[in-house]
Amino acid sequence: FPRAAHPDLDARAWAAAQHPALSGDGPLLLLPGRGTRLKGHREAIALLARLRATGMDARLWMPGTREAGRGPYVAALEAEAQSGGVADALVIAPPITEIARAYAASDLVLQLSRKPEAFGRTVIEALSVGRPVVGWAHGGVGELLAELQPPGAVPAFDEDRLFDTVKAMLAHPPPPLATMHAYTLRAMQDATLALYHDLADDRRLAIDP
């Protein structure tokens, strides 16, 4: 999918055809990730409830959460959504293979992992499709957002700032990045190999000055 300033209409129709709860004229939030509490699903559901309480017809899609062995966790999330009045605006789905299409369908991507991640692949994938990202400013996610899209970085676990940041970004989405060349697979492989060569050269100099 090309980088675009707005969700892809065909991708949005595809998402709604699979999950009617994702239909509607309001914004679609995407939180991809495994079915574990470390991924921030509860915070995303609470965010959805606050957004909808303002009158916004927001929807939340969480692909990857519904996995084998995660039944009790998913049931707890569904109960929270029900008590928060957002069960009909939430889709807790199994992993999907067409994740780029899911990014393209969304208005905004969330990265709310409670445990700092070493890299934060979701940030790169979403920005590569032109979708804005909001996430906790820690670990690799925080570093990538600070470099590539600073307005999306939120102090870790500050749910009030999360709410304000998401509202602002939905109202005024940042323009897609002109290029992501530094984060293509080839570019990152080349950078890693260059680092290995430098380390090997330093080691040779230390052994044979």
Q: How would you describe each model-predicted region?
A:
Residues V74-P94:
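Nucleotide-activated donor-binding/catalytic signature segment of Leloir-type glycosyltransferases, i.e.
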Residues P132-G135:
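Short hydrophobic beta-strand element within catalytic cores of glycosyltransferases
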